[in-house]
């Protein structure tokens, strides 16, 4: 449910140190167009879109930062066009492969967006994506947000919670259910649920390619993420012997939002070295 706003503090820090930052919004999210047909959304199509984006801008010597769907979509670019990338930063994500264990958190997320699930049935009529992000980043409790909304009450988002809620709601303001087709469909494209829509076969190939990379690879992992747990992050890092692994202690799934300056400083240190 996010967009490039998620990287706002990371971008601010990197630009202040002279780096050029490019933060695209996937189609269906952020400031990009919103395709209303849910069947349009699949990972192979988004991967192709991103490949065209990189090629049109002729991006080279890229340090790529990926998280969540950035793994399947973003790391595919590195696997297919390695000559364009000089460094990789991997945060709380995955690539489908034989033996990968989908956490209870992932399975619950799929269930909540399945037909009749908690979020599928109530977003955006009773509960907005901005409210979900305020809750997911611990700016408001579930009791004061989603539970109130489901009971017909209007959650009150104050201070930082209000700022976050407004920012993540902004791209979907006034669009209704059809305008939310991207957020509805993405969870259903996880290969645990749908191997074809999730582009599982290509993810498997890309996993092997990424693990054989010779460029610097840095893992930065939020330790409190129930979706992509720390043990998985460390296991993946161990498959790339020259990679580094940093725990972002206390960070949840959307670590860029809550721990941006810390992530930026780690990346700056690695790039300087």
Model-assigned labels for residue ranges:
Residues 10, 77, 266-270:
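Hydrophobic residues on the short alpha-helix immediately C-terminal to a glycine-rich phosphate/catalytic loop
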Residues 6, 29-65, 69-240, 247:
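Flexible "cap/lid" subdomain of the alpha/beta-hydrolase fold that forms the substrate-access gate
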Residues 1-31:
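Conserved HGGG/HGGXW glycine-rich cap/lid loop of the alpha/beta-hydrolase fold
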Residues 23-24, 66, 90, 256:
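Conserved SAM-binding loop
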Residues 242-273:
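Catalytic active-site module of serine/aspartate enzymes centered on a nucleophile-bearing elbow/loop
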Residues 13, 174, 239-242, 273:
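A short linear boundary/processing microfeature
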Residues 2, 225, 252-255:
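Glycosyltransferase donor-binding loop in the core domain
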